[in-house]
A protein has these predicted regions:
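Cytosolic, membrane-interface loops and tails of multi-pass inner-membrane proteins
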Residues: 1, 58-79, 176-203
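Small-residue-rich segments of transmembrane alpha-helices in multi-pass membrane proteins
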Residues: 18-21, 72-73, 135-152, 201-202, ...
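Membrane-embedded alpha-helical segments that form the functional core of polytopic membrane enzymes
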Residues: 18-60, 68, 97, 109-120, ...
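Transmembrane alpha-helical segments that form the membrane-embedded catalytic/substrate-channel core
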Residues: 46-54, 116-123, 165-183, 215, ...
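Multi-pass membrane catalytic core of lipid/isoprenoid biosynthesis enzymes
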Residues: 68-109, 199-223
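Intramembrane alpha-helical segments
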Residues: 81-152
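Hydrophobic alpha-helical transmembrane segments in multi-pass integral membrane proteins
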Residues: 146-156, 214-221, 270-285
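Interfacial loop-to-transmembrane junctions
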Residues: 243-273
């Protein structure tokens, strides 16, 4: 049983779902229906877990080349590729059935798009072919925002898209920080992550570019959602703290990889704090 849970990458799923509940709260202009929230989060967990399980099947030959991923259940033989594929298919179908029966048609469609996009577009088409893989493939990680919003309203507003772009621009610096830390692993697998194929200077410029757009999108989100001005101030401060982490990432520093690891951890903290802020600001407005 543990092996099948590992296939779903529940720690990654948890991070994805951090943005789902805030999106539902913003869409509902308050607390969403409890049953709807539970159904959306559970179905979203299955959908993301399905995509992750398919990813492990497809990338098992690459995973065995990387120390960080060499203990995954398909690589070790704990679970066969065929069993993992069946599992991924079943929980994916179950997630869509749950979305259809307990949420809205649009949320169901978006969940399907998210699974297909992550598996086909990101994993199969982009990841091993371009250094911009995480930029475009990362769009799948933004889908929980749209799914959560659509589960409440069966529509998408500018506020939903603003939240989408916060996650979209957050994703590259988050994953590039991880790729810096595990650069040798990605190189061994032949995965052209930007830190593997580009200079440190180029990587820093790209991380700054996306961080600035992330901060701008977070301001847009607060304004579009018509949240209190105090929440805008806190949002800007969170963004500036994020940017401050990048200042410490210096091209010639012997601590380069260590600092990148700290940025990766802070990026998770940033997204979690922003999500809590959105919920609190909406409930108090």
């Amino acid at each position: 049983m543990r092996g099948y849970l590992d296939l779903m990458k529940l720690r990654v799923v948890e991070l994805l779902l951090v943005s789902t509940l805030p999106a539902m709260v913003l869409a509902a202009k308050g607390l969403p229906d409890f049953g709807l929230a539970i159904a959306t989060i559970f179905a979203g967990t299955l959908a993301a877990g399905s995509a992750n399980a398919f990813n492990m099947v497809i990338e098992s030959d690459l995973d065995k080349l990387m120390a960080r991923t060499s203990k995954r259940p398909v690589v070790t033989g704990q679970i066969s590729k065929s069993h993992a594929t069946i599992f991924a298919t079943l929980i994916g179908l179950l997630s869509l059935i749950l979305f259809w029966n307990f949420t809205t048609p649009l949320a169901t469609l978006l969940a399907l798009v998210a699974i297909v996009f992550y598996v086909v577009v990101y994993t199969m088409a982009l990841k091993q072919r371009t250094a911009q893989n995480i930029v475009w493939g990362g769009a799948a990680g933004c889908m929980p925002v749209l799914i959560g919003w659509a589960a409440v309203t069966n529509s998408l507003s500018l506020t939903a898209w603003a939240f989408f772009f916060v996650i979209f621009f957050w994703t590259p610096p988050h994953f590039w920080a991880l790729a810096i830390k595990y650069k040798d692993d990605y190189a061994a697998a032949g995965t052209p992550m930007l830190p593997v194929v580009a200079t440190k200077g180029r990587v820093l410029k790209e991380m700054w570019f996306h961080t600035i757009l992330m901060i701008a999108s977070s301001v847009w989100l607060i304004l579009a959602a018509d949240l209190p001005m105090w929440s805008l101030a806190i949002t800007v401060v969170l963004g500036l703290v994020f940017a401050r982490q990048l200042v410490a990432l210096k091209e010639g520093s012997p601590e380069y990889a260590k600092v990148a690891g700290k940025i990766f951890q802070w990026s998770i903290t940033y997204l979690s704090l922003l999500s809590v802020l959105l919920v609190v600001a909406q409930l108090l407005s």
